[in-house]
A protein has these predicted regions:
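Thiamine diphosphate
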Residues: 1-130
Length: 130
């Protein structure tokens, strides 16, 4: 079987790789990380990945995507699903990461392994709100 090669941007590549290792994705769309969450949500809903094959993670199941009302809600979802034992991830940008800090302290304190996919964008120092 020949390998299939695709040319893609960084958001697509990160989403493709993260999908394989994720059971639950807690998302809130925020530019410039929105495409990563959108791809994961699209693949989970349609049942097909970027290659047109069944969209299953390494556990043989589709990713459960939970879109929340804010970045803080997405971080809470990540914390809760990690505590329940699920392999969990989220996608955010630098400014949204600030809203996740309280939950990140809880996640770190409980030694729960997870991945936060953070796309590059500077944190606004003149206004620490979104």
């Amino acid at each position: 079987m020949a390998r299939q090669k695709l040319s893609m941007d960084g958001n697509t590549a990160a989403a493709h790789v993260s999908y394989a290792f994720t059971e639950v994705a807690g998302i809130y769309p925020i530019t410039p990380s929105s495409p990563m969450a959108d791809y994961v949500d699209q693949w989970s809903a349609s049942g097909k990945n970027i290659l047109g094959k069944p969209a299953l993670n390494i556990f043989g199941t589709p990713v459960k995507v939970m879109e929340m009302q804010s970045e803080a809600g997405a971080a809470g979802t990540v914390h809760g699903s990690l505590a329940a034992g699920a392999m969990t991830t989220t996608y955010t940008a630098s400014q949204g990461l600030l809203l996740m800090i309280p939950n990140m302290y809880k996640i770190a304190g409980e030694l729960l392994p997870c991945v936060f996919h953070v796309s590059a964008r500077c944190v606004a120092s003149h206004a620490l709100n979104i």
